[in-house]
Amino acid sequence: MLIEPTDVASYSVYDRVKNRPEELLAQDIIEAEAEAALITGHRFEDSLYDPLPGKVKLALVKLAQYFALVNSDESASSSYQYEKMGDYSYTVSGEGRIQRPEVYHLLEEFIKPGYVPESSRLKVRSL
């Protein structure tokens, strides 16, 4: 792993993340590293990235915190919110409460030259 569970726990202000078992934080870090690899086209395993640049570490910590929050909250995976006040209750469909952190600006200088993410490729067929 490029970062440690203690890095995520010490960065976060959320008790759910700070109190999350290290084994689960390690899995959240794996998800964060996979997400960063999708953005940049590599896994930061080259000796060029030893020590890990601060921007990359911050991006990984932010992503790992996001995955820790999402993976520890069942209601975050649903876009429905339910609220009850006395005899009145309602359910709202929305975007969910936890927003994925925007880390592209932190990782853009580390994108592999010529790399085009799979999601941005166009599929064209001839007529």
From Swiss-Prot:
Pfam families: DUF3199. InterPro entries: DUF3199_YqbG, YqbG-like_sf. It comes from the Bacteria. This is Uncharacterized protein YkzL.
